[in-house]
Amino acid sequence: MLAFTWIALRFIHFTSLMLVFGFAMYGAWLAPLTIRRLLAKRFLRLQQHAAVWSLISATAMLAVQGGLMGTGWTDVFSPNIWQAVLQTQFGGIWLWQIVLALVTLIVALMQPRNMPRLLFMLTTAQFILLAGVGHATLNEGVTAKIHQTNHAIHLICAAAWFGGLLPVLWCMQLIKGRWRHQAIQALMRFSWCGHFAVIGVLASGVLNALLITGFPPTLTTYWGQLLLLKAILVMIMVVIALANRYVLVPRMRQDEDRAAPWFVWMTKLEWAIGAVVLVIISLLATLEPF
């Protein structure tokens, strides 16, 4: 039960962070200036809720880690165990994760003028911190630095891809209104950015696997089999993304009324598969790769 709680908290934390990152990415960079305020208003409530869950899950994960290190649920609620966790490498990094999650929530609630850029930088910093815990710390020396840097790139690219899909769906709603031109601009910018994000996810994901298990990656363990399932699901997402961009988008120029609903449905499917991938990632963190 404690392990399941850890998996659930990791899923909530990753998903929340990626949503805040994706919305901030649109508000700070991808959306044209004329609709940035409109997008910020549309995403604000969801961003705030995601920031709350990010902070709650990060804090709870520190306590649950104490239970995993100790004797179970009793140690989850022990301040002495929390202090012991903070003395570990995980605890030292995770304390900053909690601090940044708190600052992210404060920014989302206070809504300063440059909020999207601040949230973008804060969530990026949290993904970099996440690369300093887990399987990315298995190596030593220069290899460890390469692995952690690569894992940070993997997380940021994944957040740009997965976190940007919900804003895509909302921009599709704007296409039929007065903001049509600006919405199309935002979608095209995300498409351009998405190409790099997908390539980054694939390249860094392969390198991550090689740095953890070596070549060829092992498929005899539960960890290896889950990694293979994750890779298959990611490739399905790639196929959907390519079909959207290079099949449905050209068709929208000819018959928007028929192609647009398919585009929306496929994007929802892509997002749902991405959520399943995040569940698998959360589960992989609890397993030994060997």
UniProtKB/Swiss-Prot annotation:
Compartment annotation: Cell inner membrane
Residues in the Periplasmic compartment per record: 1-10, 71-89, 139-151, 217-222, 282-290
Membrane-spanning parts: 11-31, 50-70, 90-110, 118-138, 152-172, 196-216, 223-243, 261-281
Predominant place of localization: membrane
InterPro entries: CopC/D, CopD, Cu-R_CopD_dom
GO annotation terms (biological process): copper ion transport
Keywords assigned by UniProt, alphabetized: Cell inner membrane, Cell membrane, Membrane, Transmembrane, Transmembrane helix
One GO location term (cellular component): plasma membrane
Membrane topology, Cytoplasmic segments: 32-49, 111-117, 173-195, 244-260
Bilayer topology: Multi-pass membrane protein
Superkingdom: Bacteria
Family: Belongs to the CopD family.
Name of the protein in its database record: Inner membrane protein YebZ
